[in-house]
Each structure stands twice: as structure tokens, then as C-alpha cells.
Curated annotation (Swiss-Prot):
Gene Ontology terms: biological process: isopentenyl diphosphate biosynthetic process, methylerythritol 4-phosphate pathway
Keywords: Isoprene biosynthesis, Nucleotidyltransferase, Transferase
Name of the gene: ispD
Function field: Catalyzes the formation of 4-diphosphocytidyl-2-C-methyl-D-erythritol from CTP and 2-C-methyl-D-erythritol 4-phosphate (MEP).
Annotated organism of origin: Photorhabdus laumondii subsp. laumondii (strain DSM 15139 / CIP 105565 / TT01)
Pathway: Isoprenoid biosynthesis; isopentenyl diphosphate biosynthesis via DXP pathway; isopentenyl diphosphate from 1-deoxy-D-xylulose 5-phosphate: step 2/6
Site (Positions MEP for the nucleophilic attack): R170, K226
Listed CDD domains: CDP-ME_synthetase
Protein name: 2-C-methyl-D-erythritol 4-phosphate cytidylyltransferase
UniProt xrefs under Pfam families: IspD
HAMAP family: IspD
């Protein structure tokens, strides 16, 4: 992909960081390559993105040692490009953003960042999130936002020894999900600044927060789970069977 020209402002590029090794899965295989219902997790994730009419292209950021992605059927899809990632997730996202900044031909485009291990994304969630770009076009100066779900359970803050320190008020607490959706150049600049100053960046929104922005929380489905632990596989398979 030497030059990705977007046909209109409605076209969206997705960025999927997939350079992690998934140590919590207790598996020899990175979690994005584990199989659910005959397809790898990352293939389910890519299908959820590429089946949406507004997503024109997906950039996947891979570990330098990755040898498995090239064996998947989806590798032949012309709408997919791969780039090499960095040591941490934030480094990989920045590598993808730097690549996109050189090939989009559009300084005003927006980018959708989505976890490789979140295969259960629904298009109704995605539609609500993509409305943020429309708000920006209408002059509302949206800086972007993320899918998130309100915290439902009682939250406890612990201390050393796994002892309860106190109960945290759950009002206004949200679980941050993906996709997270921002203007490409704004996200790149914020992430670059935050990393250069050794800030603790755990998702894309935290880079914007570090630079003084306040992204929007877009209410998303709680079944948009990230496959992190072995028990998540059966749950993801159940959710996918009901899509």
C-alpha cells in the first residue's frame, strides 16, 4: 500500500495492534491465533471490521517474529496491510499511525484502533462510534472517543496482601473497550508526545488525556469482550454464535 487515497470523508481506516504474545493465556500460541469455531480470533476480528461498509482498509501491526499471519487466508485480501510493531502496544500503535500518515493522502482522516483479541464487535456499536467523525465535520470539534461500558459490579480498591482498602464509588466508572476512534494526526501527535515523556499509556484515549483532551465515552455492548484468559474462549464462542 504505497498510497491509500480515501474516496470520501465517510471512509474509515482501522488499525489493529496484533504484536502481543498473550502471556496470560498459558498457550504456546499468541492468543490472536487461537481458534474459535474454525477460525482464528484475529480472523473473526477482521471480519467484524471489514464487513462494515465504511471501513475501507485495515492495517495490522505484527510482532517482528510473527510467522503465523502469513498462513491465514485473509492475508490475500487487498484491503489489508501489515506493518512491524514495537515492544509495547503503544509503540505498535504509533508505528501503525506513522505508516498511515505517509500513505493516506488525507491529513483530516480518522483512524479506528481495535484490539486483535476482541472478535465480538457488533456493527451497531461501531455505527454509534463513527458518528463522532460526523460531529467533527459539522463543526463540533470532536476530539474522538471510545466504546465503553458502565461498571455494574461493586468495585474494591485493594492494598498489599490482597486486603480490601475501601469500596470505590462505581458511579461514573466505565470499562474502556475498543474500538477507539480519533483523528489520525491528533492521535499520532499525542501518542508520540506521551511516549517521549515516558507517560503510562494503557490505551489510545490515555494518550489524548495526557495531552489535555477529553475523549467521549460511547456506550457499548458488554459482550464486546477481549479474549485474555483461557475461560474467555468459551464465552467468545458463545457470543459469536449469537451474532
Amino acid at each position: 500500500m504505497n498510497n491509500l487515497l480515501l474516496r470520501s470523508s465517510a471512509d474509515i481506516i482501522a488499525l489493529v495492534p496484533a504484536a502481543g504474545i498473550g502471556s496470560r493465556m498459558n498457550s504456546d500460541c499468541p492468543k490472536q491465533y487461537l481458534s474459535i469455531a474454525g477460525k482464528t480470533i484475529i480472523e473473526h476480528t477482521l471480519s467484524a471490521l471489514l464487513d462494515h461498509p465504511r471501513i475501507r482498509h485495515v492495517v495490522i501491526v505484527l510482532n517482528p517474529t510473527d510467522t503465523q499471519f502469513q498462513s491465514l487466508e485473509v492475508v490475500s485480501d487487498s484491503r489489508i496491510t501489515t506493518v512491524t510493531g514495537g515492544e509495547q502496544r503503544a509503540d505498535s500503535v504509533l508505528a501503525g499511525l506513522n505508516h498511515l500518515a505517509h500513505v493516506t493522502g488525507n491529513d483530516n482522516c480518522w483512524v479506528l484502533v481495535h484490539d486483535a483479541a476482541r472478535p465480538c464487535l457488533h456493527h451497531d456499536d461501531l455505527d454509534r462510534l463513527l458518528q463522532l467523525a460526523e460531529a467533527d465535520e459539522q463543526g463540533n470539534m470532536a476530539c474522538g472517543g471510545i466504546l465503553a461500558s458502565p461498571v455494574r459490579d461493586t468495585m474494591k480498591r485493594g492494598r498489599v496482601g490482597q486486603i480490601i482498602d475501601h469500596t470505590v464509588e462505581r458511579q461514573d466508572l466505565w470499562h474502556a473497550l475498543t474500538p477507539q476512534f480519533f483523528p489520525l494526526m491528533l492521535l499520532r501527535d499525542c501518542l508520540s508526545k506521551a511516549l517521549s515523556q515516558h507517560a503510562n499509556i494503557t490505551d489510545e484515549a490515555s494518550a489524548l488525556e495526557y495531552c489535555g483532551y477529553q475523549p467521549v465515552l460511547v456506550n457499548g455492548r458488554s459482550d464486546n469482550i477481549k479474549v485474555t484468559c483461557p475461560e474467555d474462549l468459551a464465552l467468545a464462542e458463545f457470543y459469536l454464535s449469537r451474532k
